[in-house]
Amino acid sequence: MKYLYLLLCTLLGFDTMAQTGQSIEFTQIRQELQKKWPDNRTVNLVFHGHSVPSGYANTPNVKTLQAYPHQVLEAVKEIYPYAVVNSITTSIGGENAEQGAKRFKQEVLPHRPDILFIDYALNDRSIGLERALKAWEKMIKEAQKQNIPIILLTPTPDLTEDILDDKSPLEQHSRQIRRLAHDYKTGLIDCYATFKEKRKNGEDLNIYMSQSNHPNEKGHRVVTKLILNYFFEEAQWNEYCQKQTMTIMKKVADWQLMNFENQVRKGSQWANSHAYWAWTNATMYIGMAEWAKMSDDPKYWDFLLTMGEKNKWQTGPSIYFADDICIIQPYAILFSKYKEPYMIQNSVETLDTLIANPKHNSLSYYSEG
Protein backbone atom coordinates (compact mmCIF):
# COMPACT_ATOMS: atom_id res chain seq x y z
CA MET A 1 0.00 0.00 0.00
CA LYS A 2 2.85 2.38 0.84
CA TYR A 3 4.37 2.10 -2.61
CA LEU A 4 0.96 2.29 -4.28
CA TYR A 5 0.07 5.62 -2.69
CA LEU A 6 3.54 7.08 -3.34
CA LEU A 7 3.17 6.14 -7.00
CA LEU A 8 -0.27 7.72 -7.12
CA CYS A 9 1.06 10.86 -5.43
CA THR A 10 3.51 11.18 -8.29
CA LEU A 11 0.90 10.55 -10.96
CA LEU A 12 -1.63 12.91 -9.42
CA GLY A 13 0.85 15.72 -8.88
CA PHE A 14 1.11 15.81 -5.09
CA ASP A 15 4.40 16.74 -3.50
CA THR A 16 5.65 14.14 -1.05
CA MET A 17 8.52 16.34 0.16
CA ALA A 18 8.68 20.06 0.60
CA GLN A 19 10.77 22.73 2.22
CA THR A 20 9.00 24.33 5.16
CA GLY A 21 9.08 27.92 6.35
CA GLN A 22 12.15 28.36 8.53
CA SER A 23 11.05 31.35 10.61
CA ILE A 24 10.55 30.65 14.30
CA GLU A 25 7.18 32.40 13.99
CA PHE A 26 5.90 29.79 11.56
CA THR A 27 7.36 27.00 13.67
CA GLN A 28 5.37 28.35 16.61
CA ILE A 29 2.19 28.37 14.53
CA ARG A 30 2.73 24.72 13.58
CA GLN A 31 3.20 23.90 17.24
CA GLU A 32 0.01 25.78 18.11
CA LEU A 33 -1.94 23.83 15.51
CA GLN A 34 -0.91 20.55 17.14
CA LYS A 35 -2.33 21.42 20.55
CA LYS A 36 -5.49 19.75 21.84
CA TRP A 37 -8.30 21.17 23.93
CA PRO A 38 -8.14 22.70 26.49
CA ASP A 39 -4.63 23.94 25.64
CA ASN A 40 -5.40 25.05 22.08
CA ARG A 41 -6.75 28.36 20.83
CA THR A 42 -8.26 29.70 17.63
CA VAL A 43 -5.74 30.34 14.84
CA ASN A 44 -6.70 32.99 12.28
CA LEU A 45 -5.33 32.85 8.74
CA VAL A 46 -6.13 36.16 7.05
CA PHE A 47 -5.92 36.57 3.27
CA HIS A 48 -5.77 40.19 2.08
CA GLY A 49 -5.82 41.02 -1.59
CA HIS A 50 -7.86 41.21 -4.76
CA SER A 51 -10.15 38.95 -6.77
CA VAL A 52 -7.93 35.84 -6.76
CA PRO A 53 -8.03 35.11 -3.01
CA SER A 54 -11.68 36.27 -3.11
CA GLY A 55 -12.41 33.29 -5.36
CA TYR A 56 -13.43 35.05 -8.56
CA ALA A 57 -13.35 32.57 -11.42
CA ASN A 58 -15.09 33.54 -14.65
CA THR A 59 -16.27 37.00 -13.58
CA PRO A 60 -18.82 37.54 -12.06
CA ASN A 61 -18.83 33.93 -10.81
CA VAL A 62 -17.20 33.50 -7.40
CA LYS A 63 -16.06 30.00 -6.41
CA THR A 64 -15.04 30.54 -2.81
CA LEU A 65 -14.57 26.86 -1.98
CA GLN A 66 -12.17 26.38 -4.91
CA ALA A 67 -9.95 29.35 -4.01
CA TYR A 68 -6.65 28.86 -2.25
CA PRO A 69 -7.74 30.34 1.14
CA HIS A 70 -10.35 27.60 1.48
CA GLN A 71 -8.09 24.92 0.03
CA VAL A 72 -5.45 25.82 2.60
CA LEU A 73 -8.02 25.57 5.40
CA GLU A 74 -9.12 22.11 4.24
CA ALA A 75 -5.55 20.86 4.00
CA VAL A 76 -4.49 22.26 7.37
CA LYS A 77 -7.51 20.68 9.03
CA GLU A 78 -6.70 17.36 7.36
CA ILE A 79 -3.33 17.23 9.11
CA TYR A 80 -4.17 19.12 12.31
CA PRO A 81 -7.51 17.56 13.38
CA TYR A 82 -7.47 19.16 16.85
CA ALA A 83 -6.85 22.70 15.65
CA VAL A 84 -9.47 25.44 15.60
CA VAL A 85 -8.65 27.37 12.43
CA ASN A 86 -10.38 30.26 10.66
CA SER A 87 -9.68 31.16 7.04
CA ILE A 88 -10.65 34.83 6.75
CA THR A 89 -10.62 36.73 3.46
CA THR A 90 -10.50 40.51 3.60
CA SER A 91 -9.88 40.66 -0.14
CA ILE A 92 -11.97 42.67 -2.60
CA GLY A 93 -12.19 42.02 -6.34
CA GLY A 94 -10.61 44.73 -8.48
CA GLU A 95 -8.70 46.29 -5.60
CA ASN A 96 -5.03 47.30 -5.69
CA ALA A 97 -2.54 47.58 -2.83
CA GLU A 98 -3.17 51.30 -2.27
CA GLN A 99 -6.84 50.64 -1.69
CA GLY A 100 -6.04 47.65 0.49
CA ALA A 101 -3.61 49.69 2.58
CA LYS A 102 -6.23 52.38 3.26
CA ARG A 103 -8.57 49.92 4.99
CA PHE A 104 -5.83 47.78 6.53
CA LYS A 105 -6.08 49.05 10.12
CA GLN A 106 -9.88 49.05 10.19
CA GLU A 107 -10.68 45.82 8.31
CA VAL A 108 -7.64 43.52 8.54
CA LEU A 109 -5.82 43.98 11.83
CA PRO A 110 -8.99 43.66 13.95
CA HIS A 111 -9.12 39.99 12.89
CA ARG A 112 -5.91 39.48 14.89
CA PRO A 113 -4.17 37.39 12.21
CA ASP A 114 -1.86 34.61 13.30
CA ILE A 115 -0.59 34.62 9.72
CA LEU A 116 -1.30 37.37 7.20
CA PHE A 117 -1.16 36.72 3.45
CA ILE A 118 -0.91 39.68 1.04
CA ASP A 119 -1.74 39.17 -2.67
CA TYR A 120 -2.15 42.35 -4.75
CA ALA A 121 0.35 42.31 -7.60
CA LEU A 122 -2.05 41.51 -10.44
CA ASN A 123 -3.94 44.76 -9.90
CA ASP A 124 -0.90 46.82 -8.91
CA ARG A 125 0.04 47.17 -12.56
CA SER A 126 -2.52 49.98 -12.71
CA ILE A 127 -0.67 52.05 -10.08
CA GLY A 128 2.92 51.20 -10.99
CA LEU A 129 5.89 49.91 -9.04
CA GLU A 130 6.61 52.98 -6.89
CA ARG A 131 3.08 53.44 -5.56
CA ALA A 132 2.69 49.70 -5.07
CA LEU A 133 5.94 49.59 -3.09
CA LYS A 134 4.75 52.29 -0.68
CA ALA A 135 1.42 50.53 -0.14
CA TRP A 136 2.99 47.13 0.48
CA GLU A 137 5.54 48.61 2.87
CA LYS A 138 2.79 50.41 4.78
CA MET A 139 0.84 47.18 5.32
CA ILE A 140 3.96 45.19 6.21
CA LYS A 141 5.11 47.74 8.78
CA GLU A 142 1.68 48.02 10.40
CA ALA A 143 1.42 44.24 10.71
CA GLN A 144 4.95 43.83 12.03
CA LYS A 145 4.27 46.42 14.73
CA GLN A 146 1.82 43.86 16.10
CA ASN A 147 4.26 40.96 15.60
CA ILE A 148 2.07 39.34 12.95
CA PRO A 149 3.87 36.82 10.71
CA ILE A 150 3.44 37.82 7.07
CA ILE A 151 3.59 35.85 3.84
CA LEU A 152 3.81 37.84 0.60
CA LEU A 153 2.57 36.35 -2.68
CA THR A 154 3.89 37.10 -6.13
CA PRO A 155 1.08 37.10 -8.74
CA THR A 156 -0.62 34.22 -10.45
CA PRO A 157 -0.51 34.49 -14.27
CA ASP A 158 -2.32 36.86 -16.56
CA LEU A 159 -2.49 35.19 -19.96
CA THR A 160 -2.55 38.56 -21.72
CA GLU A 161 1.12 38.93 -20.71
CA ASP A 162 4.00 36.74 -21.82
CA ILE A 163 5.12 35.08 -18.60
CA LEU A 164 8.48 34.27 -20.21
CA ASP A 165 9.20 37.95 -20.82
CA ASP A 166 11.63 39.06 -18.10
CA LYS A 167 10.60 42.68 -18.66
CA SER A 168 6.86 42.18 -18.33
CA PRO A 169 4.99 44.25 -15.70
CA LEU A 170 4.13 41.20 -13.60
CA GLU A 171 7.75 40.05 -13.62
CA GLN A 172 8.82 43.48 -12.37
CA HIS A 173 6.22 43.44 -9.59
CA SER A 174 7.31 39.91 -8.68
CA ARG A 175 10.92 41.04 -8.29
CA GLN A 176 9.79 43.90 -6.10
CA ILE A 177 7.80 41.54 -3.86
CA ARG A 178 10.79 39.21 -3.55
CA ARG A 179 12.92 42.16 -2.43
CA LEU A 180 10.27 43.16 0.10
CA ALA A 181 10.20 39.64 1.51
CA HIS A 182 13.99 39.70 1.82
CA ASP A 183 14.23 43.19 3.30
CA TYR A 184 11.43 42.73 5.83
CA LYS A 185 12.19 39.06 6.52
CA THR A 186 8.67 37.89 5.69
CA GLY A 187 7.55 34.62 4.21
CA LEU A 188 7.29 34.40 0.42
CA ILE A 189 5.04 32.40 -1.89
CA ASP A 190 6.53 32.78 -5.37
CA CYS A 191 3.50 31.90 -7.47
CA TYR A 192 4.84 33.73 -10.51
CA ALA A 193 8.13 31.83 -10.59
CA THR A 194 6.27 28.53 -10.19
CA PHE A 195 3.91 29.15 -13.09
CA LYS A 196 6.78 30.54 -15.14
CA GLU A 197 8.68 27.29 -14.62
CA LYS A 198 5.64 25.32 -15.73
CA ARG A 199 5.48 27.37 -18.92
CA LYS A 200 9.21 26.87 -19.54
CA ASN A 201 8.64 23.13 -19.21
CA GLY A 202 6.08 23.26 -22.01
CA GLU A 203 2.86 23.32 -20.01
CA ASP A 204 -0.13 25.21 -21.37
CA LEU A 205 -1.12 27.62 -18.60
CA ASN A 206 -4.69 27.73 -19.92
CA ILE A 207 -5.36 24.51 -18.01
CA TYR A 208 -4.82 26.44 -14.76
CA MET A 209 -7.08 29.39 -15.61
CA SER A 210 -10.80 30.20 -15.46
CA GLN A 211 -10.21 33.34 -17.50
CA SER A 212 -7.10 35.23 -18.53
CA ASN A 213 -6.35 36.64 -15.07
CA HIS A 214 -8.17 34.28 -12.68
CA PRO A 215 -6.95 30.77 -11.85
CA ASN A 216 -9.36 27.85 -11.78
CA GLU A 217 -9.42 25.22 -9.05
CA LYS A 218 -6.33 23.54 -10.47
CA GLY A 219 -4.49 26.87 -10.58
CA HIS A 220 -5.45 27.62 -6.99
CA ARG A 221 -4.16 24.16 -6.07
CA VAL A 222 -0.69 25.20 -7.27
CA VAL A 223 -0.75 28.18 -4.89
CA THR A 224 -2.11 26.04 -2.06
CA LYS A 225 0.74 23.56 -2.35
CA LEU A 226 3.26 26.39 -2.07
CA ILE A 227 1.53 27.81 1.01
CA LEU A 228 1.37 24.42 2.71
CA ASN A 229 5.16 24.32 2.82
CA TYR A 230 4.83 26.70 5.77
CA PHE A 231 2.50 24.32 7.60
CA PHE A 232 3.78 20.82 6.84
CA GLU A 233 6.94 18.99 7.79
CA GLU A 234 8.10 16.14 5.53
CA ALA A 235 6.19 13.47 7.47
CA GLN A 236 3.04 15.58 7.32
CA TRP A 237 3.43 15.99 3.57
CA ASN A 238 3.50 12.21 3.25
CA GLU A 239 0.41 11.89 5.42
CA TYR A 240 -1.43 14.58 3.50
CA CYS A 241 -0.44 13.02 0.19
CA GLN A 242 -1.74 9.65 1.29
CA LYS A 243 -5.05 11.06 2.51
CA GLN A 244 -5.58 13.07 -0.67
CA THR A 245 -4.78 10.04 -2.81
CA MET A 246 -7.20 7.90 -0.82
CA THR A 247 -9.89 10.54 -1.23
CA ILE A 248 -9.47 10.57 -5.01
CA MET A 249 -9.44 6.77 -5.18
CA LYS A 250 -12.68 6.63 -3.20
CA LYS A 251 -14.34 9.13 -5.53
CA VAL A 252 -13.33 7.03 -8.55
CA ALA A 253 -14.53 3.79 -6.94
CA ASP A 254 -17.86 5.33 -5.90
CA TRP A 255 -18.37 6.71 -9.41
CA GLN A 256 -17.87 3.21 -10.80
CA LEU A 257 -20.45 1.80 -8.42
CA MET A 258 -22.95 4.50 -9.27
CA ASN A 259 -22.58 4.22 -13.06
CA PHE A 260 -21.70 0.57 -13.59
CA GLU A 261 -25.14 -0.84 -14.43
CA ASN A 262 -25.80 1.96 -16.91
CA GLN A 263 -22.58 1.08 -18.72
CA VAL A 264 -23.49 -2.61 -18.87
CA ARG A 265 -26.97 -1.85 -20.20
CA LYS A 266 -25.74 0.75 -22.69
CA GLY A 267 -23.16 -1.53 -24.29
CA SER A 268 -21.53 -0.36 -27.51
CA GLN A 269 -21.24 -1.24 -31.20
CA TRP A 270 -19.17 -4.28 -30.22
CA ALA A 271 -21.17 -7.26 -28.99
CA ASN A 272 -20.54 -8.16 -25.33
CA SER A 273 -18.07 -5.29 -24.94
CA HIS A 274 -19.71 -4.30 -21.64
CA ALA A 275 -21.01 -7.67 -20.46
CA TYR A 276 -20.39 -8.53 -16.82
CA TRP A 277 -17.61 -10.91 -17.86
CA ALA A 278 -16.05 -8.55 -20.47
CA TRP A 279 -12.35 -7.81 -20.08
CA THR A 280 -13.11 -4.08 -19.81
CA ASN A 281 -15.08 -4.78 -16.65
CA ALA A 282 -12.76 -7.54 -15.42
CA THR A 283 -9.85 -5.14 -15.25
CA MET A 284 -12.01 -2.70 -13.30
CA TYR A 285 -13.01 -5.48 -10.86
CA ILE A 286 -9.33 -6.17 -10.16
CA GLY A 287 -8.72 -2.53 -9.33
CA MET A 288 -11.90 -2.43 -7.24
CA ALA A 289 -10.71 -5.46 -5.27
CA GLU A 290 -7.41 -3.72 -4.50
CA TRP A 291 -9.35 -0.67 -3.35
CA ALA A 292 -11.66 -2.85 -1.25
CA LYS A 293 -8.60 -4.19 0.58
CA MET A 294 -7.54 -0.62 1.42
CA SER A 295 -11.00 0.64 2.34
CA ASP A 296 -12.89 -0.16 5.52
CA ASP A 297 -16.24 -0.01 3.70
CA PRO A 298 -17.69 -3.47 2.82
CA LYS A 299 -19.80 -2.09 -0.02
CA TYR A 300 -16.94 -2.59 -2.49
CA TRP A 301 -16.70 -6.30 -1.72
CA ASP A 302 -20.52 -6.47 -1.88
CA PHE A 303 -20.40 -4.96 -5.36
CA LEU A 304 -17.90 -7.59 -6.53
CA LEU A 305 -19.94 -10.42 -5.03
CA THR A 306 -23.07 -9.12 -6.75
CA MET A 307 -21.19 -8.98 -10.04
CA GLY A 308 -20.14 -12.62 -9.65
CA GLU A 309 -23.69 -13.70 -8.86
CA LYS A 310 -25.16 -11.80 -11.82
CA ASN A 311 -22.57 -13.40 -14.06
CA LYS A 312 -23.22 -16.81 -12.47
CA TRP A 313 -19.43 -17.09 -12.05
CA GLN A 314 -19.09 -17.85 -15.78
CA THR A 315 -16.38 -16.84 -18.24
CA GLY A 316 -16.93 -15.51 -21.75
CA PRO A 317 -17.89 -17.75 -24.70
CA SER A 318 -14.38 -18.49 -26.05
CA ILE A 319 -11.77 -20.14 -23.86
CA TYR A 320 -9.10 -19.35 -26.47
CA PHE A 321 -9.77 -15.62 -26.40
CA ALA A 322 -7.93 -13.90 -23.54
CA ASP A 323 -10.57 -11.17 -23.29
CA ASP A 324 -13.20 -13.80 -22.49
CA ILE A 325 -11.28 -15.45 -19.64
CA CYS A 326 -9.83 -12.31 -18.06
CA ILE A 327 -12.74 -12.49 -15.61
CA ILE A 328 -11.11 -15.51 -13.95
CA GLN A 329 -8.71 -13.30 -12.01
CA PRO A 330 -11.46 -11.33 -10.17
CA TYR A 331 -13.14 -14.64 -9.34
CA ALA A 332 -9.84 -15.92 -7.94
CA ILE A 333 -9.46 -12.79 -5.80
CA LEU A 334 -12.95 -13.29 -4.37
CA PHE A 335 -12.24 -16.97 -3.74
CA SER A 336 -9.05 -16.11 -1.87
CA LYS A 337 -11.12 -13.91 0.46
CA TYR A 338 -14.30 -15.96 0.91
CA LYS A 339 -13.03 -19.53 0.28
CA GLU A 340 -16.23 -20.52 -1.54
CA PRO A 341 -15.40 -23.23 -4.15
CA TYR A 342 -18.38 -22.36 -6.38
CA MET A 343 -16.75 -19.02 -7.14
CA ILE A 344 -13.99 -20.65 -9.17
CA GLN A 345 -15.54 -23.99 -10.18
CA ASN A 346 -16.33 -22.89 -13.73
CA SER A 347 -12.97 -21.11 -14.00
CA VAL A 348 -11.05 -24.25 -13.01
CA GLU A 349 -13.00 -26.33 -15.55
CA THR A 350 -12.31 -23.73 -18.25
CA LEU A 351 -8.58 -23.69 -17.55
CA ASP A 352 -8.42 -27.50 -17.37
CA THR A 353 -10.08 -27.69 -20.78
CA LEU A 354 -7.70 -25.11 -22.19
CA ILE A 355 -4.64 -26.99 -20.90
CA ALA A 356 -5.94 -30.34 -22.14
CA ASN A 357 -6.81 -28.98 -25.58
CA PRO A 358 -4.14 -26.49 -26.63
CA LYS A 359 -4.56 -24.79 -29.98
CA HIS A 360 -1.75 -25.29 -32.50
CA ASN A 361 -3.29 -23.43 -35.42
CA SER A 362 -3.56 -19.67 -35.83
CA LEU A 363 -5.74 -17.76 -33.41
CA SER A 364 -5.89 -14.71 -35.67
CA TYR A 365 -9.28 -13.17 -36.18
CA TYR A 366 -10.65 -10.35 -38.27
CA SER A 367 -12.33 -7.34 -36.72
CA GLU A 368 -13.76 -4.36 -38.55
CA GLY A 369 -12.57 -0.96 -37.46
Give the location of each predicted region.
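Bacterial Sec-dependent N-terminal signal peptides
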Residues: M1-G21
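Short catalytic helix/loop segments, enriched in acidic residues and glycine
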Residues: V62-K77, G308-E309
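Low-complexity, Ser/Thr/Pro/Gly-enriched N-terminal "stalk/linker" regions
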Residues: E239-T306, P341-E349, T353-L354
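Short glycine-rich His-centered loop
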Residues: E32-K63
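Alpha-helical cap/lid subdomain in secreted, periplasmic
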Residues: I24, Q28, Q34, P38-D39, ...
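Aromatic- and glycine-enriched pocket-lining scaffold segments that form the walls
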Residues: N361-G369
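Sec-dependent signal peptide cleavage junction
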Residues: T16-T27, N238-T247
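Well-ordered alpha-helical segments within folded domains of soluble proteins
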Residues: W277-A292, Y320-S336, G369
